[in-house]
């Protein structure tokens, strides 16, 4: 079982800002749709929304659904998750969601590993942050642009994260 990321201090401020922007870009407070938070961690998004969404994480303690591909979701959120997957795994995940619901929309937060993220890791003593990164920012963006239509985006949240609201082409 893998550990979910724990946020405190300045990293919690950063993370909550990202979630606020995800909620805003998807108008998530004002809709009644079936939402999946893929990589939910400690369910911060659900707490901020103050409404029930389905949560799924590599840490099974947070899972509320066994097979995410058997449920028809309207919106799936990947926040700082795709970077831990190989490019083929990312493509396969999108293919499986496409087979289930061609109208599914996604809100994807992509972290940038840059000078500021290195400073933040050192300030917060979170030296292992992004340790398991497999797919780069450019790898993730390339897959999104090839398979998705970008509906909205918010760039440079604290210069370290871009958020894309997309749907299948």
Describe these PLM feature segments.
Residues 1-68, 94:
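Conserved N-terminal segment of class I S-adenosyl-L-methionine
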Residues 77:
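A conserved beta-strand element that flanks and buttresses the S-adenosyl-L-methionine
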Residues 80-84:
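Short catalytic micro-motifs in class I SAM-dependent methyltransferases
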Residues 91-104:
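A short glycine-rich, Lys/Arg-flanked "PGG" loop and its adjoining helix->strand segment in the class I
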Residues 103-111:
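Conserved beta-strand signature within the Rossmann-like core of class I S-adenosyl-L-methionine
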Residues 113-131:
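Short, glycine-/aromatic-enriched active-site segment of Class I SAM-dependent methyltransferases
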Residues 131-147:
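Short alpha-helix
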Residues 149-159:
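Conserved S-adenosyl-L-methionine
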């Amino acid at each position: 079982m893998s550990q979910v990321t724990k946020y405190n201090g300045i990293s919690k401020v950063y993370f909550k800002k990202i979630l606020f922007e995800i909620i805003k870009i998807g108008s998530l407070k004002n809709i009644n749709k079936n939402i999946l938070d893929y990589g939910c961690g400690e369910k911060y998004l659900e707490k901020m929304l103050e409404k029930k969404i389905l949560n799924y994480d590599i840490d099974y303690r947070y899972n509320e659904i066994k097979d995410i591909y058997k449920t028809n979701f309207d919106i799936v959120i990947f926040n700082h998750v795709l970077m831990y997957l190989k490019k083929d795994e990312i493509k396969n995940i999108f293919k499986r969601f496409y087979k289930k619901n061609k109208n599914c929309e996604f809100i994807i937060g992509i972290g940038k590993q840059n000078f500021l993220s290195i400073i933040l890791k050192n300030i917060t003593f979170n030296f292992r942050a992004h340790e398991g990164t497999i797919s780069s920012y450019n790898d993730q963006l390339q897959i999104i642009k090839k398979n998705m239509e970008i509906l909205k985006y918010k760039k440079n949240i604290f210069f370290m994260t871009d958020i894309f609201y997309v749907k299948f082409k």
